[in-house]
Amino acid sequence: MTTNLSNRHRDTLERIFSHPSSGNIEWRQVRSLLEALGAVTEDHAGNLTVTLGGETEVLRRPHGKDVDQQMIVDLRRMLARAGFAAAGR
Protein backbone atom coordinates (compact mmCIF):
# COMPACT_ATOMS: atom_id res chain seq x y z
CA MET A 1 0.00 0.00 0.00
CA THR A 2 3.01 2.26 0.01
CA THR A 3 3.65 2.27 -3.73
CA ASN A 4 2.19 5.75 -4.25
CA LEU A 5 4.30 7.38 -1.54
CA SER A 6 7.24 9.62 -2.27
CA ASN A 7 10.70 8.50 -1.19
CA ARG A 8 10.53 10.99 1.68
CA HIS A 9 7.25 9.53 2.94
CA ARG A 10 8.53 5.95 2.59
CA ASP A 11 11.62 6.91 4.60
CA THR A 12 9.46 8.38 7.38
CA LEU A 13 7.30 5.24 7.41
CA GLU A 14 10.43 3.04 7.64
CA ARG A 15 11.72 5.09 10.57
CA ILE A 16 8.39 4.83 12.41
CA PHE A 17 8.46 1.02 12.11
CA SER A 18 12.21 0.59 12.76
CA HIS A 19 13.42 -1.23 15.88
CA PRO A 20 14.84 0.27 17.96
CA SER A 21 12.77 3.31 17.14
CA SER A 22 14.43 6.46 15.91
CA GLY A 23 14.64 9.35 18.35
CA ASN A 24 14.69 12.03 15.70
CA ILE A 25 11.52 11.77 13.65
CA GLU A 26 10.24 15.28 13.13
CA TRP A 27 6.59 16.21 13.62
CA ARG A 28 6.48 17.91 10.22
CA GLN A 29 7.62 14.66 8.56
CA VAL A 30 4.94 12.66 10.39
CA ARG A 31 2.28 15.20 9.49
CA SER A 32 3.30 15.16 5.83
CA LEU A 33 3.17 11.35 5.77
CA LEU A 34 -0.27 11.27 7.38
CA GLU A 35 -1.59 13.85 4.93
CA ALA A 36 -0.34 11.65 2.07
CA LEU A 37 -2.03 8.55 3.53
CA GLY A 38 -5.39 9.82 4.74
CA ALA A 39 -7.67 12.66 5.74
CA VAL A 40 -6.09 15.12 8.18
CA THR A 41 -7.63 18.17 9.84
CA GLU A 42 -5.99 20.49 12.35
CA ASP A 43 -7.74 22.25 15.21
CA HIS A 44 -6.86 25.67 16.64
CA ALA A 45 -4.41 24.11 19.14
CA GLY A 46 -2.44 22.34 16.41
CA ASN A 47 -3.78 18.87 17.18
CA LEU A 48 -4.42 16.63 14.20
CA THR A 49 -7.50 14.51 13.61
CA VAL A 50 -6.37 11.72 11.31
CA THR A 51 -8.65 9.26 9.52
CA LEU A 52 -6.95 6.18 8.06
CA GLY A 53 -8.69 3.02 6.97
CA GLY A 54 -11.98 3.99 8.60
CA GLU A 55 -10.43 4.72 12.00
CA THR A 56 -9.98 8.19 13.44
CA GLU A 57 -7.26 9.23 15.90
CA VAL A 58 -6.38 12.57 17.45
CA LEU A 59 -2.65 13.28 17.70
CA ARG A 60 -1.42 16.05 19.93
CA ARG A 61 1.33 18.25 18.57
CA PRO A 62 4.60 17.64 20.47
CA HIS A 63 6.26 20.49 22.33
CA GLY A 64 9.53 20.11 20.44
CA LYS A 65 10.18 19.39 16.79
CA ASP A 66 10.58 15.61 17.28
CA VAL A 67 7.87 13.11 18.19
CA ASP A 68 8.34 11.16 21.42
CA GLN A 69 8.54 7.39 21.85
CA GLN A 70 4.90 7.05 22.92
CA MET A 71 3.71 8.82 19.78
CA ILE A 72 5.85 6.46 17.68
CA VAL A 73 4.13 3.49 19.36
CA ASP A 74 0.72 5.08 18.72
CA LEU A 75 1.63 5.78 15.08
CA ARG A 76 2.77 2.18 14.55
CA ARG A 77 -0.51 0.88 15.94
CA MET A 78 -2.63 3.29 13.89
CA LEU A 79 -0.72 2.64 10.66
CA ALA A 80 -0.70 -1.14 11.13
CA ARG A 81 -4.47 -1.20 11.74
CA ALA A 82 -4.96 0.79 8.54
CA GLY A 83 -2.88 -1.75 6.59
CA PHE A 84 0.31 0.25 6.24
CA ALA A 85 3.72 -1.12 7.13
CA ALA A 86 7.33 -0.48 6.32
CA ALA A 87 8.67 -2.07 3.14
CA GLY A 88 9.43 -5.74 3.56
CA ARG A 89 6.94 -6.27 6.39
For each predicted feature, which ranges?
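Basic nucleic-acid-binding interfaces
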Residues: 1-89
